[in-house]
Amino acid sequence: MTNKTILFCVLIFSGFIYVFIGGLENIERKSFEAFYSSKPDLNFQNNLNKRIDNLLKIKSNTPSQLNLLATQLLADGRYSESSKVFNFYIDTYSDFVDSDIYSSFAESSYLNNKMKFNNNIVSLLDKSLFLDPSNHKALTMKGLFNFENGKFNDALKNWVIALENVDSDDQKKSLIIVMNSALKEIEINKNKNTN
């Protein structure tokens, strides 16, 4: 046998051993790793959608992998793609959906919808708060929804509970600012009613 033939046989045998020992799950796991380590190219958006579709077709996806993917897409400002993954997660792993999944899906949907609420977003917030009435992200967004609809007392109630449940000083400062806005609106409405 020639050296090329021996090398070829060793490569084939190594590939067989790799698949046999690690299984197809190992290859599928590598798909997620490749997704995170790739660099954007000229056709990034088209490739991103195709790559997400391919990842969602993998049978051995775990809820944690999908949650990490959706959360990373949300953090990267890829709201449409994040919403797509969260939606797939909820449809596929309904037994694993918690309050944070619903609130993150609501956030990505809200940002994807040009920061406008719709019935689906409000429903996601309600589901999140049903599972965890102290979910600060859902409370913050529900407060914003109430504020935009002139329900300043309800907004203030949401934000007070959210304030009790956030750890970040920046989040606390932001909540205090919007709470002050709600208090001003309540005072303005109170003065209108007394005149």
Q: Would you name each region that the model predicts?
A:
Residues 54-58, 89, 127-128, 161-162:
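Canonical positions in the second alpha-helix
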Residues 45-48, 79, 115-118, 152:
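TPR-repeat structural position
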Residues 71-75, 81-132, 137, 141:
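Alpha-helical adaptor scaffolds
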Residues 24-37, 60-69, 95-112:
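Amphipathic alpha-helical repeat scaffolds of TPR domains
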Residues 7-14, 161-195:
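Terminal, low-structured helical/coil segments at or just beyond the last alpha-helical repeat
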Residues 75, 111-114, 148, 181-185:
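Register position in tetratricopeptide repeats
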Residues 65, 99-101, 138, 171-175:
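TPR alpha-solenoid repeat register
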Residues 1-58:
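Long, contiguous interaction/recruitment modules in multidomain scaffold/adaptor proteins
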